[in-house]
């Protein structure tokens, strides 16, 4: 009788998503899926459907597609970087996990490769253990919460459920804090130290925070720990929030407003990073690196630099490995060959 193969384990790195190409039709498809999620837009469904289909989707895709085209490099930067992260982590876990079959895969909450489709494919290939690692360092119902929703909806359709473990977030993980601090040190070794260091996180509407979303507190904790690691004084750094959408109040202070105030009040040099993003994308490469640079310089600032996300840096893969390997090992047991 042929012996059973060891269980196959899949680690999924899950990011938010990106259009398939930098064109208005592709962006429209992506935005419709993204902005139709009630986790993202908490407005009565009927009312929001009218706003989305009559006002947002007819006008916004063309403008957003042009922004994507300015940063496109054969594919979306987010997808390119996520694929690189997957390849690096896959090699590390495969080297450690023999004789167990472990593989790492990319998935997206919106767009391709969609999380349910990836799970369907892996399940058909014999995967019976999933480690879900949403690469959102700070939990929010609008990001990680949507991953939980997608997994739940997928699970409702399954007769024979696999084992699933989800990493909620890692906003204060020591390796994450150190990786951020070291990336800032390396950048400043080349570009010098600025008058102000800005930690700009993607914002969420203020009512979401009022209802209990822990995201703002997690962002503040991350920024404070990195600032402490760097030995910064309170007046040398600030936390802010970017990427507002719509007319309602979002969590403050707003990144662009602070930059205008700094530029007009005599602050000459600024460096900015966004710890909320595990991979550079439209919000960092276009909004932070280009738009907000123009905002600061136009207001009177003289020097502005964007510090890249952790992307596929070795220290970032160290972090991803540190979070996923113990979960894989827990299922793989302690057989010889696991390091």
Curated annotation (Swiss-Prot):
Listed under GO biological process in this entry are: heme biosynthetic process
Q: Which GO terms describe its cellular component?
A: cytoplasm
Q: What are this entry's molecular-function GO terms? A: ferrochelatase activity; metal ion binding
Q: What is its EC number?
A: 4.98.1.1
Which amino acid positions bind Fe cation, per UniProt? 202, 283
What keywords are assigned to this protein?
A: Cytoplasm, Heme biosynthesis, Iron, Lyase, Metal-binding, Porphyrin biosynthesis
Q: Which SUPFAM superfamilies match?
A: Chelatase
According to its UniProt entry, the function of this protein is described as: Catalyzes the ferrous insertion into protoporphyrin IX.
Q: What is this protein called?
A: Ferrochelatase
List the lineage, top down. Bacteria, Pseudomonadati, Pseudomonadota, Gammaproteobacteria, Moraxellales
């Amino acid at each position: 009788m042929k012996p059973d193969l060891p269980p196959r384990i899949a680690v999924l790195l899950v990011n938010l998503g990106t259009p398939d190409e930098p064109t208005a039709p592709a962006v429209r498809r992506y935005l419709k899926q993204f902005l139709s999620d009630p986790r993202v837009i908490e407005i009565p469904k009927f009312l929001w459907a009218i706003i989305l289909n009559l006002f947002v989707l007819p006008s916004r895709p063309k403008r957003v597609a042009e922004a994507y085209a300015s940063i496109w490099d054969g594919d979306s930067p987010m997808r390119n970087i996520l694929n690189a992260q997957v390849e690096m982590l896959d090699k590390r876990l495969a080297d450690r996990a023999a004789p167990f079959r472990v593989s790492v895969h990319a998935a997206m909450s919106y767009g391709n490769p969609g999380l349910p489709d990836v799970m369907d494919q892996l399940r058909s290939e014999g995967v019976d253990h999933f480690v879900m690692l949403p690469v959102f360092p700070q939990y929010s119902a609008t990001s990680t919460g949507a991953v939980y929703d997608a997994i739940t909806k997928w699970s409702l359709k399954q007769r024979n459920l696999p084992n699933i473990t989800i990493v909620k977030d890692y906003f204060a993980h020591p390796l994450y804090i150190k990786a951020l601090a070291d990336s800032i040190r390396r950048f400043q070794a080349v570009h010098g130290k600025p008058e102000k260091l800005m930690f700009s996180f993607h914002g969420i509407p203020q009512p979401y925070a009022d209802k209990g979303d822990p995201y703002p507190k997690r962002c503040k904790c991350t920024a404070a720990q990195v600032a402490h690691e760097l030995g910064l004084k309170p007046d040398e750094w600030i936390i802010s929030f970017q990427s507002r959408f719509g007319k309602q109040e979002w969590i403050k202070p707003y990144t662009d407003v602070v930059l205008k105030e700094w530029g007009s009040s005599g602050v000459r040099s600024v460096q900015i990073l966004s710890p909320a993003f595990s991979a550079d994308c439209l919000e960092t490469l276009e909004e932070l690196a280009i738009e907000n640079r123009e905002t600061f310089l136009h207001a009177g600032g003289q020097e502005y630099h964007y510090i890249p996300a952790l992307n596929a840096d070795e220290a970032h893969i160290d972090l991803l490995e540190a979070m996923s390997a113990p979960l894989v090992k827990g299922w793989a047991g302690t057989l010889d060959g696991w390091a």
